[in-house]
Design a protein with these regions (language model features):
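N-terminal amphipathic/basic leader segments beginning at the initiator methionine
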Residues: 1-20
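Short amphipathic alpha-helical segments with heptad-repeat character
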Residues: 6-9, 122, 164, 233, ...
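Amphipathic alpha-helices that form helix-helix packing interfaces
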Residues: 15, 198-201, 243-246, 262
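Mg2+-dependent prenyl diphosphate-binding active-site environment of isoprenoid biosynthetic enzymes
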Residues: 24-229, 264-267
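Short amphipathic alpha-helical surface patches that serve as generic macromolecular interface elements
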Residues: 202, 221, 237-244, 256
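Mobile late-domain/C-terminal helix-loop "cap" segments
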Residues: 228-250
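Short, amphipathic C-terminal "tail helix"
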Residues: 254-269
Length: 269
């Protein structure tokens, strides 16, 4: 992973410093837990994609850092809220806010991160604000639809639509906002659409192979619908191939190489 992110190491270091300034500046008695949650072995996949595409599209704009911050704050807030809905006790080998403080304080902590994101959004363009509003709404509707279908073995199309709405949107939103700053290669959005869907399905497969908490929570995923891990893995592989084909129009560079390697690393080569 270090080799993959090396070309954007400076951008990621700046991002971490900016994120700490935003998250840790407010007086919040849960701040030590929030700091651990936000800064202990983070993946930062969304900011990494944003910075790589910014380099590929030669976007030199201070809003790139803001878009990465907003995307990560919304993603982090969604994790806290997901833990409440799923009644999860641990995340990344640490107690969740829900487990440690109960649903009321956990909701507020997630809302706190959302408020920080909204504050940042207010300093962007009108188009970027509309993009985030649209995608956040779709994500929430996806969560509502998932809960409506709990304990129902739905068809594959319904599962894919739910997965796209609930999870893929939080990958897509940052890049859609970024692409609004460039007149070139806006068709690259289809790359992240295919990648994000594959990424979540792979997570569902990993969950099915390990603790099966999705099934316990009444959330039936692709391995259950197919009754086959092999078919589910093939589905992910096909989405990965489709995603990588979308990069053929991009000229070769260290950033494109990192993008390809990141997709392979996270989805399986």
């Amino acid at each position: 992973m270090d080799k993959i992110i090396f070309p954007i190491k400076n951008e990621l270091n700046e991002f971490e410093n900016n994120l700490k300034k935003v998250v840790l500046k407010e007086d919040n008695f849960l701040i030590s837990d929030l700091e651990k949650f936000m800064f202990t072995n983070p993946k930062r996949l969304r900011p990494i994609f944003i910075f790589l595409f910014a380099k590929i599209l030669k976007i030199e704009n201070c809003l790139v850092q803001d878009i990465a911050l907003i995307t990560e704050l919304i993603h982090s807030a969604s994790l806290i809220h997901d833990d409440i809905i799923d009644e999860e006790k641990t995340r990344r080998n640490n107690p969740t806010f829900y487990e440690k403080y109960g649903s009321k304080l956990a909701v507020l902590e997630g809302d706190f991160l959302l408020s920080l994101a909204l504050e940042k959004i207010s300093n962007t363009t009108l188009e970027i604000s509309k993009i985030f509003a649209k995608r956040i709404k779709k994500t929430i509707l996806g969560e509502i639809n998932q809960n409506e279908n709990l304990n129902n073995l739905t068809n594959i199309e319904t599962y894919l639509n739910k997965t796209y709405a609930k999870t893929a949107n939080l990958f897509i939103v940052g890049l859609e906002a970024l692409f609004s700053l460039s007149r070139e290669n806006k068709n690259l959005l289809s790359f992240i659409e295919n990648y994000a869907l594959a990424f979540q399905i792979k997570n569902d497969i990993d969950n099915f192979k390990s603790n099966k908490s999705d099934i316990k929570n009444g959330n039936y995923t692709l391995p259950m619908l197919y009754s086959s891990l092999e078919k589910s893995l093939d589905f992910v592989e096909n989405l990965k191939i489709k995603a990588l084909k979308e990069l053929n129009s991009i000229e070769n560079s260290i950033y494109k190489t990192s993008l390809i390697e990141l997709a392979k690393y996270t989805l399986g080569s």
